[in-house]
Regions:
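Primarily a LysM-type cell-wall glycan-binding module
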Residues: 63-95, 398, 403-412, 449-450, ...
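C-terminal motif of bacterial Sec signal peptides marking the signal peptidase cleavage site
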Residues: 24-26
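Metal-dependent polysaccharide deacetylase catalytic core of the NodB/CE4 family, i.e.
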Residues: 134-147, 169-172, 182, 190-194, ...
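Extracellular LysM carbohydrate-binding repeats and other cell-envelope/extracellular binding modules
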Residues: 58-68, 86, 90-131, 427-448, ...
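N-terminal pre-catalytic segment of deacetylase/amide-hydrolase enzymes
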Residues: 57, 63-64, 114, 120-194, ...
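Bacterial signal peptide processing site
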Residues: 28-30
């Protein structure tokens, strides 16, 4: 999947939280632009099935009523000069929330006269849609230096080019705190989000990385191992305190950077002492020097196992990162979050391969209103038919504008796309809150959706009991696509359903780990995933006839040429 290519959402918008949609019937009002200036443009609404009757004579000032407002939405008409940033400041109270408008409408620029629907709250914290789910890449750097000085020491010009490309392609470097809220199912992130991390704690971060990150407005987290702090080329505690005041985050990377897995000849007692030193001692130092403990860990070498996980939980870490080269869904297991290491020899194309932001996957089969399977799997991806830019909706055109959303809701429900149909009903009721017919249709649709979700959860639980994890995962994904805030579906996906599809590869003469990675992933650097999955020793040749498990990577389809 092309990660730098601009991806227009396959439906014009996704649904606000199902449980909140009834609020649209209670709080709707129309404001003049004298009270609140109008909003953003996006796609024009579908044309109504019939022309409106002749309009009554507008009352004085009525021609300015171009903003429809409810608890969940603001519907506006774009005026010259409107931008997402300005509209976010005006209607959401924060210009930095412009991403909500851009992601919801699927565009970054607007034209005069277009209808714009602005969500007033995050509408899909899990990022699960009928056609797939959102992924967030986490990148890990080590040392940034004047020039490339080795695989893990990246020259500042190389680093600047990578940051510039992220910025140019519309990526937003979100904070670790926001990302962890996303992985808890409590925070929606921009469609093109990335998390930037820096391991070990090199002092060169201040000279080379910090200025560029500030220039591009990017957040970053430093994972430091405590024995390196204040030693040699490491950052000092005062450096770390200063970086925190500047908006950077600092978390733990163990005490000595030793592998946390138990050694073959290590006794249980010796291992217990060592793991306590590696995991607990840094927490004490954080409290002493930074005024708070770390709550997130980057495993040295990205290596962990079930025994390590138990100790990580014991010492109070809530999230931990590997170096598995893949992006993360919201429901990733929080103690095995993946990161992709960035190397000095990477080309721009290599770098881009680490920025996958969506997993294309039909998460469920839509059903029509009579319960039959929808005729085309592509129906879930179809966008409503749009017409030329609509004229600004003066009050007498309110019914016509609302009717277009009600008509679209009926079409979507017939195709079996219940969540998208609910969304259109809620928007229609934002525009015309007194529409009894739309209110009744919304209530009926909410009941049908709730019934569908309950059935999916029951099916998923039964499949889990039979050990059919892949099929169970599908049911819970569909439930989450219908109800984005369903905690049962989210927590089951995160904690109980961890099946990864894989292919068994039989090693042939001449095969190497990089060549096998190239065969299946189209990327030789994904060899790291094969090594981790199969617990291979580094630099040991593969044996003809050897069986390798090749795991599926979210957002990276198997090549298989």
């Amino acid at each position: 999947m092309g990660t730098f290519a601009a991806r227009r959402p396959l439906l014009r918008r996704s649904l606000l939280m199902v449980g909140l949609l009834l609020a649209a019937t209670a709080c709707s009002s129309v404001r003049s632009d004298q009270a609140s200036a109008p909003g953003v443009p996006g796609e024009p609404s579908a044309s109504p099935s019939s022309k409106p009757s002749a309009p009554p004579s507008p009352k004085p000032g009525a021609k300015d009523a171009e903003v429809f407002d409810s608890r969940d939405f603001v519907v506006v008409v774009a005026k010259p000069g409107d931008t997402a940033e300005g509209l976010a400041a005006r209607h959401l109270g924060d210009p930095h929330k412009k991403w909500m408008i851009e992601d919801y409408m699927g565009v970054r620029t607007f034209s005069e006269g277009q209808e714009v629907v602005i969500p007033k709250r995050e509408w899909n914290p899990g990022g699960v849609f009928p056609w797939g789910y959102q992924l967030v890449p986490v990148l890990v750097y080590h040392r940034i230096s004047a020039e490339n000085e080795g695989k893990l020491s990246i020259g500042v010009r190389h680093f600047e080019a990578q940051m510039r490309s992220l910025h140019a392609e519309g990526f937003r470097a979100v904070s670790l705190a926001d990302f962890l809220e996303f992985t808890a199912g409590r925070r929606q992130l921009p469609r093109k989000s990335v998390v930037l991390t820096f391991d070990d704690g090199h002092r060169s971060f201040i000279q080379y990385a910090r200025p560029l990150l500030k220039d591009f407005g990017f957040n970053a987290t430093l994972f430091v191992y405590s024995d390196f702090i204040g030693a040699g080329s490491g950052l000092s505690w005062s450096d770390l305190r200063a970086l925190i005041t500047q908006g950077f985050d600092v978390q733990a990377h163990s005490k000595t950077h030793g592998n946390l897995r138990r050694k073959e000849d290590e006794s249980q007692a010796a291992y217990a002492r060592r793991i306590e030193s590696e995991l607990a001692y840094p927490l004490d130092l954080f409290r002493k020097h930074l005024g708070r403990a770390a709550d997130t860990l980057a495993y040295p070498y990205g290596d962990t196992d079930e025994e390590v996980l138990r100790h990580v939980v014991k010492y109070g870490y809530v999230a931990a990162f590997t170096v598995r080269r893949q992006s993360n869904p919201a429901f990733v297991f929080p103690l095995k979050i993946s990161r992709s290491q960035i190397y000095s020899e990477m080309t721009p194309k290599d770098f881009a391969r680490n920025l996958t932001v969506f997993q294309d996957q039909e998460v469920g089969t839509a059903r029509t209103s009579d319960g039959k399977l929808a005729g085309s799997s592509g129906a879930a991806r179809a966008q409503p038919v749009a017409t030329a830019a609509a004229a600004p909706p003066v009050p007498w055109a309110r019914d016509r504008l609302a009717a277009s959303h009600n008509e679209r809701a009926e079409q979507l429900e017939q195709r079996g796309h219940l969540r998208q149909a609910l969304e259109e009903r809620a928007i229609a009721l934002t525009i015309n809150p007194g529409d009894r017919r739309a209110q009744e249709a919304q209530k009926r649709l909410e009941g049908r959706t709730a019934q569908e979700v309950a059935g999916l959860l029951k099916e998923g639980r039964a499949l889990l009991g039979r050990g059919l994890l892949g099929e169970a995962q599908q049911r819970f994904l569909v439930a989450l696509s219908l109800d984005p805030t369903n905690r049962t579906a989210f927590e089951t996906l995160q904690n109980e359903v961890r099946e990864v599809m894989s292919i068994v590869h039989t090693v042939r003469s001449g095969d190497t780990c990089p060549s096998v990675a190239e065969l299946y992933y189209g990327d030789r650097l994904r060899c790291e995933v094969i090594v981790e999955t199969n617990r291979l020793a580094l630099n040991v040749p593969l044996r003809p006839g050897q069986k390798l498990k090749i795991p599926e990577i979210p957002g990276v389809p198997f090549q298989l040429r």
